[in-house]
Amino acid sequence: MTTVSRETHERLERFADLLVQWNAKINLVSPRDIAQLWPRHIEDSLQLAELIPEGKTITDLGSGGGFPGIILAIATGNPVTLIESDQRKCAFLREAGRICEARVTVIAKRIEAASPPPADIITARALAPLNRLLEWARPLLKEDGFCLFLKGQKAQAELTEASADWHMSHSIIPSRTDPGGAIIKVSDFKRVV
């Protein structure tokens, strides 16, 4: 388990309680995952916090139930922009930000239509193949920024496929919460001409 301060743990507990309440009304996580909320979702998202320097801006793509965006805002204290097209999920994200005292801005638009200020870091979890994530991330990322994408067992295959379309610096960091999963860190990426 990732070590966090008592205050941060309390804020994460508030988030978990709120998510359980809202999940009864709107589908934020699958009902079978509620029992595994901490290891499956919160801990999985928390492992990114150690890779994020203090004070860096973050944009989370397809924020849904707040993973990893809200968790990172709580754990790091960094400002996080959450992009989510589902209005009901946006209402949840705003309430979670308020209840958990997290520095979040919620943009209720499709990723392609959103135009937040460029971020230092782009994150996403369980959203789309790497190729698509890079396409969405490129215009939203600062020149010297990087991306952190939580991926499952197909991480290496997605990286191989994306390498045909993108020049990039990358590394694969084994997931601490999913034996077959990985974090793909990407920087300096541009389309192959």
Swiss-Prot record:
<dbReference type="InterPro" id="IPR003682">
    <property type="entry name" value="rRNA_ssu_MeTfrase_G"/>
</dbReference>
<keyword id="KW-0808">Transferase</keyword>
<keyword id="KW-0698">rRNA processing</keyword>
<dbReference type="Pfam" id="PF02527">
    <property type="entry name" value="GidB"/>
</dbReference>
<feature type="binding site">
    <location>
        <position position="125"/>
    </location>
    <ligand>
        <name>S-adenosyl-L-methionine</name>
    </ligand>
</feature>
<keyword id="KW-0963">Cytoplasm</keyword>
<keyword id="KW-0489">Methyltransferase</keyword>
<dbReference type="InterPro" id="IPR029063">
    <property type="entry name" value="SAM-dependent_MTases_sf"/>
</dbReference>
<protein>
    <recommendedName>
        <fullName>Ribosomal RNA small subunit methyltransferase G</fullName>
        <ecNumber>2.1.1.170</ecNumber>
    </recommendedName>
</protein>
<feature type="binding site">
    <location>
        <position position="62"/>
    </location>
    <ligand>
        <name>S-adenosyl-L-methionine</name>
    </ligand>
</feature>
<dbReference type="GO" id="GO:0070043">
    <property type="term" value="F:rRNA (guanine-N7-)-methyltransferase activity"/>
</dbReference>
<feature type="binding site">
    <location>
        <position position="67"/>
    </location>
    <ligand>
        <name>S-adenosyl-L-methionine</name>
    </ligand>
</feature>
<comment type="similarity">
    <text>Belongs to the methyltransferase superfamily. RNA methyltransferase RsmG family.</text>
</comment>
<feature type="binding site">
    <location>
        <begin position="111"/>
        <end position="112"/>
    </location>
    <ligand>
        <name>S-adenosyl-L-methionine</name>
    </ligand>
</feature>
<keyword id="KW-0949">S-adenosyl-L-methionine</keyword>
<comment type="function">
    <text>Specifically methylates the N7 position of guanine in position 527 of 16S rRNA.</text>
</comment>
<dbReference type="GO" id="GO:0005829">
    <property type="term" value="C:cytosol"/>
</dbReference>
